[in-house]
Amino acid sequence: MFRGATLVNLDSKGRLTVPTRYREQLIESATGQMVCTIDIHRPCLLLYPLPEWEIIEQKLSRLSSMNPVERRVQRLLLGHASECQMDGAGRLLIAPVLRQHAGLTKEVMLVGQFNKFELWDETTWYQQVKEDIDAEQSATETLSERLQDLSL
């Protein structure tokens, strides 16, 4: 399970160094093989260990290519999916088209989200966090039953 937000830097080749605390887990569970794709709702990237991505691919394969909405989701997620292999120094090369999509240049937030990571431009990440907190503080809708059961 991946959790927490960590500031990492992209080098001049577009590689990020995976924090040490995640490397062993990624080597054991995925032999360092990852898949990166776009988030279709937010300006960030999604980074999955290969076995987790294969589950997503199976679900995507069950969608209908005749349904325009389902086909669009398939096209966006699969069309942008890029395999990346963690090298001996714990680095992952993020494809240029993906870096451009999320506006990633130098400082990147690696955000653990259970079975995957989100990759955000640092400034965009902090703006999103502020928007999310503001939305929660001004929320008028009733919490879902699942959120009501979440006791913090």
From Swiss-Prot:
Keywords: Cytoplasm, DNA-binding, Repeat, Repressor, Transcription, Transcription regulation. CDD domains: MraZ_C (cd16321), MraZ_N (cd16320). Its main location: cytoplasm. One of its GO terms (molecular function) is transcription cis-regulatory region binding. One of its GO terms (biological process) is negative regulation of DNA-templated transcription initiation. Negatively regulates its own expression and that of the subsequent genes in the proximal part of the division and cell wall (dcw) gene cluster. Acts by binding directly to DNA. May also regulate the expression of genes outside the dcw cluster. Forms oligomers. This is Transcriptional regulator MraZ. It comes from Salmonella paratyphi A (strain AKU_12601). The lineage of its organism: Bacteria, Pseudomonadati, Pseudomonadota, Gammaproteobacteria, Enterobacterales. The gene is mraZ.
